[in-house]
Regions:
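Walker A/P-loop
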Residues: 1-8
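Accessory, often C-terminal, charged low-complexity segments
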Residues: 11-206
């Protein structure tokens, strides 16, 4: 819909100091071409909902008294194709096609995929909720599992020995890194695997 549920939840939290959450689901349904919404620049109902939530957030925050604060932030997710390349199995007898496919998958990430999109896709693969607390520090995404309290680290920007040491110091339960970030440095990759194992940290290279 147009975000009425989100508006009501934020308003109620402002009134009684609650910390309720909301989830709104909307198909990308287009607005009527002759509607006032379309004239105002809203091509889909989802766009209307997002703008309503933004305006409601500002209105509610501006109306708070005595320095009170509530969290009126929200995230927007859209269904999309994977950010990782999909392996296409060639015919067994076609060695040239197999070689081409191997070359294409040296880097498993699609070039146009953002780090944030990769992060949330990997979170879903690992069974982490989209509502988990996410922070970004020193080129590392940290995700706190709201159910177990476990810390997950995602290396999606760069990898070097100093960064590995800094991540391990935070005692995560699991670390995931993009394979391409090792840039063919097998020694660094092997040392990383050994360090993670010695520290009792699960490690995944993607």
């Amino acid at each position: 819909g147009s975000g009425t549920t989100a508006h009501a939840v934020m308003q109620l939290n402002a009134e009684d100091g609650g910390s309720r959450r909301f989830i709104c689901v909307q198909l990308s349904e287009e607005t009527d071409e002759k509607s006032e919404a379309r004239k105002a620049g809203f091509n889909t109902i989802a766009e209307i909902a997002k703008e309503r939530i933004r305006r409601a957030s500002r209105q509610i925050s501006d109306g708070l008294q005595d320095g009170s604060e509530i969290d009126t932030g929200f995230k927007v997710f859209k269904l999309a194709e994977s950010g990782f390349k999909q392996w296409r199995q060639p015919e067994q007898s076609d060695t040239e096609a197999l070689q081409r496919e191997l070359s294409l998958n040296i880097d498993s990430v699609l070039s146009e995929t953002s780090s944030e999109n990769l992060l949330y896709e990997l979170m879903l693969r690992m069974g982490l909720k989209l509502t988990c607390k996410v922070s970004f520090s020193d080129d590392v995404y940290f995700v706190e599992d709201e159910d177990t309290g476990g810390l997950y680290a995602f290396l999606l920007k760069r990898v070097d020995q100093g960064l590995i040491d800094a991540v391990l110091a935070k005692q995560p339960v699991k670390v995931a890194a993009l394979d391409r970030l090792f840039e063919g440095d097998d020694a660094l990759k092997s040392n990383t695997v050994l360090q993670m194992r010695d520290a009792g940290v699960m490690f995944e290279c993607v």
